Amino acid sequence: MVYAIIVAAGEGKRAGFEIPKQFVKLNNKTILRMSAEKFQNSASIDKFLVVSHRNYVDLTEKEVKIFSKFENVVIGGSNRQESVYNALMYLGKKENKPDFVCIHDAVRPFVDTNKIDESIYKAKEIGGAVLAEMAENTISQVNNGRIVKTLERSQIYLHHTPQTFDFNKLLKAYQKAEKILSSFTDDASIFIHAGYETAIVEDYKNNIKLTKKEDFELAKCIFELNS
């Protein structure tokens, strides 16, 4: 069984909207609903959870309860890592635990359903898989505003979501890193820290994360191109 965890627990202050950015609409549909729809349509996903800020549980449920694969809203923590951990612990208490879990940022509404399926297929083969975009620009390592060295860009990938993992291994990885969760920037880094192998699945560039207000202007362009 494969569960998706859609992380929608942020308040989205950087985006400058009056409401959290996952509830901002593109063409009369919220970002959250757009993302949830992708997992509803994936043949590889059996069920999904949504992690929500405690102040927006009702609004979150209203947006996703229309989907047959939706199971529950889990209250998030003080940061993304704690929010995912809460969802993993919820799943860990179930009698029928998932075999794999697919974790996605709600504010990446343009993820391709085929890429979701591809990441799950690769995770079943390796143990973990991350959608990622190969770097095209020159990448430098910097110290105090000065370039230390130029990195080999053919070996650099920019992580996206979803990120898919063997559920038991990911839960163990989170438990192992419980006291230092805030030092990690994504689920793959926690999984790798525990010593587990993780593969890259090359992703499309338009699977952008909507973080700032200008990202939403780009999102409108992507939406129009895809329509």
UniProtKB/Swiss-Prot annotation:
Protein's job: Catalyzes the formation of 4-diphosphocytidyl-2-C-methyl-D-erythritol from CTP and 2-C-methyl-D-erythritol 4-phosphate (MEP).
PROSITE patterns: ISPD
Keywords from the named record: Isoprene biosynthesis, Nucleotidyltransferase, Transferase
The family this protein is said to belong to: Belongs to the IspD/TarI cytidylyltransferase family. IspD subfamily.
Segment forming the signal sequence: none
GO molecular function, one term: 2-C-methyl-D-erythritol 4-phosphate cytidylyltransferase activity
UniProt-annotated site: Transition state stabilizer, residues: R14, K21
Designated name of the protein: 2-C-methyl-D-erythritol 4-phosphate cytidylyltransferase
Gene that this polypeptide is encoded by: ispD
Tagged with keyword Acetylation: no
Enzyme class: transferase
Keyword Nucleotidyltransferase belongs to the record: yes
Transmembrane residue ranges: none
SUPFAM superfamilies: Nucleotide-diphospho-sugar transferases
Residues marked Positions MEP for the nucleophilic attack (site): R153, K209
Biological or metabolic pathway of the protein: Isoprenoid biosynthesis; isopentenyl diphosphate biosynthesis via DXP pathway; isopentenyl diphosphate from 1-deoxy-D-xylulose 5-phosphate: step 2/6
Any one of the GO BP annotations: isopentenyl diphosphate biosynthetic process, methylerythritol 4-phosphate pathway
EC number assigned by the record: 2.7.7.60
Catalytic activity: 2-C-methyl-D-erythritol 4-phosphate + CTP + H(+) = 4-CDP-2-C-methyl-D-erythritol + diphosphate
Pfam families: IspD (PF01128)
